Amino acid sequence: MGLQKIVKKYNKKMKRKGLAGLDTAIILIAFIITASVLAYVAINMGLFVTQKAKSTINKGEETASTALTLSGSVLYAVNYPSNTRSYWIYFTVSPSSGVSSVELSPTTTAISFTASTEGVAYSNIYKYTLLTVDPSSLGHAVYANGQYLNLINQQTSAGQTYVYYPNPYYALLALNYTLYNYYLSTKTPSPIFINSSTLSSIPQWLKNDNSFTFTLNISGQLVTYDVFVNQTFAFTYPVAGDPLIGSAIAPAGSVIGVMILFGPDLGSHVFQYQTVTIQITPNVGSPLTISEYIYQPEGSVSVIG
């Protein structure tokens, strides 16, 4: 009997220890599960925050990045050496790296010009584009030196046909012809008039315009054109890499010419020892801002940037 009591007492003691061990194990498992859940939540929260931050950064980059980039020199024309009149500013832009295309229609894109020192600020001066003009409509636009001038060139490469204007003056002639036909049909005055023969006397309707000349070598003969501008405006045209004939969209790899023509008001200012700012705001991305400090015009056409 004594042995049986001892055995029972021993078994009872061991049973209690077993239960105590089981309780401890359950509590430990509970802690492990809780810790795992908290770790899972923390990791997922961390991933969520990381993804959210990444999304915010990407969105910020998308907003901050410009869809267009300056792709050439900035030129400025004046009546050198008198330096009493300004005529135009010209430069080229291209879609930025990683941008597939940019729409450059005057209805979706704005161009502004500012010269704070002179108290000059013009907004939304972008009025016309030659990107939408069919090259076939310009075949008989300008007659000079016994022939029709080929204003626009076409080049085919890898099955694509690219159109471009050889220089800004050819684009000016094309713009003049296009606007003349448009305004002739609508009975409203064109903002630009170009004449290839010297006028014996300037008509009354041109006397207040800002005027300048340019000369082209056409089949060995120099032909001088008189340009009259009655309002400040900007226009664009294809310079290279534009296969989208008839569309205002500038695809990746293309080069687009931008020309700001000064009317009589802005033409009376000559910019020197000051900064001029041009801003292009397309329908995507942030504006392209071009700020150039002009020391002093060094010729009829000066490189200012």
Swiss-Prot record:
An example of a GO molecular function for this protein is: structural molecule activity
**InterPro entries xrefs:** Flagellin/pilin_N_arc, Flagellin_arc
Q: List the Pfam families.
A: Arch_flagellin (PF01917)
GO CC annotation terms, alphabetical: archaeal-type flagellum
Q: Where in the cell is it found?
A: Archaeal flagellum
User: Does the record carry Kinase as a key word?
Assistant: no
- The residues of the propeptide are 1-18
Q: Which domain of life is it from?
A: Archaea
Query: After translation, how is this protein modified?
Result: Glycosylated.
Q: Which UniProt keywords apply?
A: Archaeal flagellum, Glycoprotein
**Where does this protein have coiled-coil stretches?**
none
One Gene Ontology term of the biological-process aspect is: archaeal or bacterial-type flagellum-dependent cell motility
Function text: Flagellin is the subunit protein which polymerizes to form the filaments of archaeal flagella.
Q: What else is known?
A: Flagellar filament preparations contain two major bands with molecular weights of 31 and 33 kDa and several minor higher molecular weight bands; both major bands have an identical N-terminal sequence.
Similarity section: Belongs to the archaeal flagellin family.
Name this protein carries in UniProt: Flagellin FlaB2
Top-level taxonomy:
Archaea, Thermoproteota, Thermoprotei, Sulfolobales, Sulfolobaceae
